[in-house]
Structures are given as C-alpha cells and as structure tokens.
Amino acid sequence: RRPPRSTPLYSSAASDVYKRQPQVNIHGFSPPELHHFTKMNSLSIEEVLGRLKTAGLGSIPGGGAEILVDRVREGMTRGKVDTENWLNTMRVWHRMGGRSSATMMYGHIETLEERIEHMERIRQLQDETGGFTAFISWTFQPDNTPLADIQPLGAYEYLKVQAISRLYLDNVDNIQSSWVTQGLKVGQLALLYGANDMGSLMIEENVVAEAGTVHFLTLDQIRDSISELGYSPRQR
C-alpha cells in the first residue's frame, strides 16, 4: 500500500538522504507538488518549504510551469497551481536562499505572444530574486494525450525558441538543452542556438515517456556531443 504523500513523509526522506550523503544536492518537489503538500497538511507554502529546507532540500525543479498564463493553464493544467502561486513558490524559496530552475512547455494551445509573456514573468522574477540557475524549454509531446490531434513542433521551431530564450533571458546564466524530448542530435544543435547546458543524466523519466518520447544518454555521450562541436565539457 502506497503511503500518504505528506510533508512529514518527504521531509523524513530528504533528511535521511542528506544525513547519509551530505555532499549530494537534493533537487526535488516542483511547485504543483509543493502546493499539494500545503493542502494535505494545512500548511502555508512558507512552512512547507521551511521544513523541507531544514530537512536538507537543496534546490527545486521548475516543473509544472508549462505556460505561465492563466488562460492557457485553465485549458492545459486545470487543477494544478495557477500562475501567481507558481511564481510565488519560487519567490519564497529564493528568499530562503534556495535555488531552482525554470521551465516552459510550448506548442499546444498557447499563442506566440503568450510564450513571450511566460518568459517575461520568469525574467521579472529573476530580476527580483536572482534565484533561477537555468531555463529549460521543450515542445509539447501530444501522443497519448487528450490533445493528440495537435501537430507536434519540429526541430526548427524548437531551436528558434532556444535562441529567443537566450536573448530574452539574459539574466539567467544557463539555458539548458532538452535532449530528453528532442533527442541527441537536436539537443546537440541547441548548443549552437543559445544553450550552454546539456542537463544531467536521468535514471528514470515518466512524464514525456507516457507520450511515447524516450531518450536516455550516458555521461560519455553527453561529453562527446559537447566536444564534437569544439566546446569543452564542464560539470557545474
């Protein structure tokens, strides 16, 4: 029987990992998950984040951002955290000294203007807190979803958005390539379109995999893809 997903449970898990491997950065719990904890435990987001930080949480992923425009969120992510609460979760975490990534999933029901509106909200919060370490964008994978009739965006559109995000988000140090959704070759090309980060190894991925997109790379493949373009791989 799966245990209830409560803040005390995850605080204990984070604390156990931190005590055993204090050199490991615990990167977990996106804003939608954190807000779920607030509802399950009748706690404020400040209390939830404070407990997890005390337990050893090091950084949080930018998952669940999709497009930070409520018109889009009502159609795509109804029931998830709204735009303001997603941003405020990051704001609170950054003010606690925590760091996080920011994401954008596009190519569904959003307009081009709403993609820029999303980037502008990330940019404004970064100006305020400086807490985002990386921005990762990827194209919507429609297979096996209620929007399966949408034509998926190709490499040209993906690389164009990569370049735009690098120009627009000049206050975010790292723009990450999404080889997880685009595959190795396009992920490698992204390094020529503004990306300077190939992300990390993945042990398991279940979100885009449900839409039929599965890409896994070894450390050597990631290093080689960087070196082939004349760059020197570095771990951050």
Cite the ranges covered by each PLM segment.
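Alpha-helix N-cap and loop-to-helix initiation/capping positions
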Residues: 40-47, 77-85, 110-117, 150-157, ...
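Conserved, mostly hydrophobic/aromatic
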Residues: 60-63, 93, 122, 165, ...
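Auxiliary Fe-S-binding modules of radical SAM enzymes
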Residues: 20-21, 126-236
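Generic structural signal for well-ordered alpha-helices
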Residues: 12-15, 49, 87-90, 119-123, ...
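Conserved strand-turn element in the central/C-terminal portion of the radical SAM core barrel
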Residues: 27-37, 68-70, 77-78, 89-114, ...
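Single conserved hydrophobic/aromatic residue that forms the stacking wall/gate
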Residues: 2-14, 18
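Non-cysteine beta-strand/loop elements that form the S-adenosyl-L-methionine
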Residues: 25-29, 49-68, 96, 129-140, ...
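Catalytic cores of alpha/beta
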Residues: 44-48, 109-123, 182-193
